[in-house]
C-alpha cells in the first residue's frame, strides 16, 4: 500500500514495515532479539548479490554509454527499423526471449534494457512499454526446466523438473504467442501515441544516424575504442550466460577493464564512477531493505501462515476446481509472496487440500507455476524487479500499475489454454 500510494520511497517503506513487524514479534515473545537479528541477516544475505550486481552493472553500462558504444549500435538499429515502432517492440520481445534462455531475470534485464532503452528514447516510446514487453516475454520463458519456479514446484512434487516442464510445454507455446502478440499490440499503441505527439517527434527520431557528431560534442566519447567496448560487452554477457562466476563479479571485472582502457588518470576515473554512483546506490539500498523485509516476513513464518490462511478461504464445495481457483489468483498472490514462500509454503498446503478432493497435485503445481510466472517480474518482493525498473528508470508503483492488468490477462489466457488443451483437468 505504501508503495502504490507513493507515501514514501521503497527503501524506507520496506525497512519501516519490517522494523515495526519485528518489534511486535519480539514484544509479544514470539521471537527473541537474537532470532530476529538472524532473520534480518538471512534476508539481506539472500539479496546482497543482486544489490552488488546492480551497482556494478549500472556502472558498467554507464561507462559504455559515456564511451559512445551505444550511440553507434543504436544508430545501426535505427537504420534497420527506421521509424517502425512495431519493429522495435518485436525486437525487444525477441531479445528478451533469447536473453532469458538461461532462466535468469537479472541477466535478461541487463541484456535487453540497456540495448533497447536508447531506441525507445529516440522514438519517444514509453519506458513502461519496454518493461511490459520484457516481463511478458521473461515470464513465459521462465517456465523452462532450469527456471527457478519450475524447479521449486518439481521438488515439492518429488519429480524431475523436465517431467513437469514436458506437461507445461503446450501452455508455454501459447504464452510465447501471447508475448509476440503483446509486442505487436503495444507497438500499435505506441505508434498511435507518438502520432498524437506530432510529426516533429517522429522526424526527430528519423534523423538519427551513427555519425560522429554526438561523439565530437561528448568529451567522454571514445570512438576509437568502439571495437574493444563491443568485445568487452559481449564477453561480459557470454560469461553471464555461462554462469561460471557470480554475476556481480563479472561486472566488477568488466567495469575495471572498461574504465582502465577508456579513461586514463585517477581524477577522470573517479569522476566517471561518481557520475553513476547515485542511481546505483539508490536502487541497491532499496534491494537491501527489501531483503530485510523478506527476511522478517519469511523466516518468521508470517508468509507461511498467510499461505495457510489463503488455503483455508477456499470453500469445500469448490475443492475440485482448486487448480483453476489458484490459477486465477496467482497474479495477485505473486505481489504478496516471494518465490520460496509461494512454492514451498503455499503449494504443499494446496496439494494437501487438493488430495481430499482427488485433485492431481501436478495440475495444481502447473496452474501455480504458469499463471504466477506471468507476474514474477512485476512483484515488489522479487529482487530482479528492482533491477529492471532501475535500469529503465521507472518507479515501482508505475511499473505495477502499467503491467498488472495486462499480466493478469495473459495469465488467465494461459490458464484457459491449459484447460482446453487438457494440460489441466478436473
Residue spans for each PLM region:
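Hydrophobic alpha-helical transmembrane segments of multi-pass integral membrane proteins
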Residues: 55-56, 82-115, 313-352, 356-357, ...
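Membrane-interfacial loop-to-helix junctions in multi-pass transporters
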Residues: 45-51, 77-91, 122-130, 224-228, ...
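Re-entrant/interfacial helical elements at transmembrane boundaries that shape
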Residues: 72-74, 106-119, 147-159, 306-308, ...
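Long, contiguous bundles of hydrophobic transmembrane helices that form the permeation core
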Residues: 1, 20-24, 28-29, 166, ...
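Transmembrane alpha-helix interface/packing and boundary motifs in multi-pass membrane proteins
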Residues: 2-8, 61, 95-104, 135-142, ...
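Core transmembrane alpha-helical segments of multi-pass membrane transporters/permeases
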Residues: 37-71, 97, 248-249, 256, ...
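Membrane-helix interface "capping/anchor" motifs
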Residues: 2-13, 121-129, 265, 274-275, ...
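Membrane-core helix-loop-helix motifs of multi-pass transport proteins
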Residues: 118-205, 220, 360, 384-426
